[in-house]
A protein has these predicted regions:
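Glycine-rich phosphate-binding loops of nucleotide-dependent enzymes
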Residues: 98
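P-loop (Walker A) phosphate-binding loop of NTP-binding proteins
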Residues: 8
Length: 124
């Protein structure tokens, strides 16, 4: 069974996915990790520089194709995919969407030190 987990930023997608996988012995796949690994393999060590480059579309396509391949060839395996769009590429997956209150998401983002506080507060 393939489970695709998506949701709003800072909703806990990764945390929930990893906890589920550990408890039920599923394989964990994160498309964000796949994307970063492929970007690094293609010479993009600085993600900010990479985001400004047109090659982002090529890496996106590689990740999408890997997810499609998993959906076609590994459908009987126990896998959780933490991804924004895997549900779209694997229509037969069990789909989970995790929601989060905007204030909770902002607090999590601040606590994780992912961004400048002023940038986050302007988002709220």
């Amino acid at each position: 069974m393939i489970i695709t987990i998506t949701g709003k930023p800072c909703s806990g997608k990764g945390t929930v996915s990893k906890m589920f996988c550990q408890k039920y012995n599923f394989e964990y796949i994160c498309t964000g990790d796949m994307f970063r690994a492929l970007a690094k393999e293609n010479g993009f060590d600085n993600i900010l520089t990479f985001q400004l480059n047109e090659d982002i579309k090529k890496i996106d396509a590689l990740v999408d194709n890997q997810i499609i391949d998993i959906g076609k060839n590994r459908i009987s395996e126990n896998i959780v995919i933490d991804s924004r769009l895997a549900w779209h590429f694997i229509p037969q997956s069990f789909k989970v969407f995790i929601d989060v209150d905007l204030n909770v998401a902002a607090k999590r983002l601040l606590e994780a030190n992912r961004e400048n506080e002023n940038t986050i507060l302007s988002f709220i």
